[in-house]
A protein has these predicted regions:
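Non-catalytic, mostly N-terminal accessory regions of nucleic-acid modification and defense proteins
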Residues: 1-195, 199
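Short glycine-rich loop/turn motifs that provide flexible caps or phosphate-binding loops at active sites
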Residues: 174, 208-210
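Conserved class I S-adenosyl-L-methionine
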Residues: 198-207
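Conserved SAM-binding loop of SAM-dependent methyltransferases across substrates and taxa
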Residues: 210-221
Length: 221
């Protein structure tokens, strides 16, 4: 099902609105990107009929881990916590469980602490805020199992939109850690990636930041 990018972006930015006040964009981006990742992975695995396999297998393992270890690590587990006390603590445990089973996610997905009272408030304030935040990611336009953004890469579009907005709101130059998709596409074409026939050729971006230029290079190859 096609979804308008304006709808997608509006819901993503609404999730940011829920966190304003307790922290600035350089901090709440970690919360939003974590939720976006969890929602995307959950939806995609559901769509493939492999919901019980929601995990990226640790490269150190040469066989599937115990199936029991795969459970309790999805966005649906966040949904089950809505309206409950200590929801932040529960969300942190779910994320920690996923990070423990996937060493590549250590220090990436678990840097945002959903039980931080200084940033999210305490007691009912935190519970209500996180419940509302989860509800936003349940909106139809954020259903990544079925939606396509006008034929484009929907998760890439969502990520680039957020990075652009975070860069602008934090007062930093957009080019400091984010290269607009339009610029990345032009650069990928200028260096002639599409005409390269050497399978061993590589692209180096020593200041890759969020990696948008490298992604566009792959698209052009």
């Amino acid at each position: 099902m096609a979804v308008k990018k304006t709808q997608l972006y509006a819901s993503l930015w609404a999730s940011c609105d829920k966190l304003r006040g307790g922290m600035d964009s350089s901090e709440y981006k970690d919360y939003i990107l974590t939720l976006l990742f969890m929602k995307y992975v959950t939806d995609k695995f559901k769509n493939k009929g492999a919901y019980e396999d929601i995990k990226v297998f640790d490269k150190a393992h040469d066989k599937d881990p115990d199936p029991e270890k795969r459970t309790g690590c999805s966005f649906d587990d966040f949904i089950a916590l809505k309206g409950k006390k200590n929801i932040g603590e529960g969300m942190d445990k779910i994320i920690a469980r996923l990070a423990d089973e996937n060493t590549d996610l250590k220090g990436v997905i678990d840097i945002a602490h959903f039980n931080d009272e200084k940033k999210l408030g305490s007691g009912k304030e935190m519970d209500d805020k996180l419940t509302d935040l989860i509800s936003i990611f349940q909106r139809p336009e954020l259903d990544f199992s079925r939606n396509k953004a006008e034929g484009d890469d929907i998760i890439g579009d969502a990520y680039e939109f957020l990075m652009r907005k975070f860069a602008t709101e934090s007062g930093k130059s957009k080019g400091q850690f984010y290269t607009p998709a339009e610029v990345s596409r032009i650069l990928a074409n200028v260096v002639g990636i599409s005409h390269c026939t050497d399978a061993s050729a590589t692209v180096c971006d020593p200041a890759c930041g969020s990696g948008s230029l490298l992604i566009r290079a792959i698209d052009a190859a």
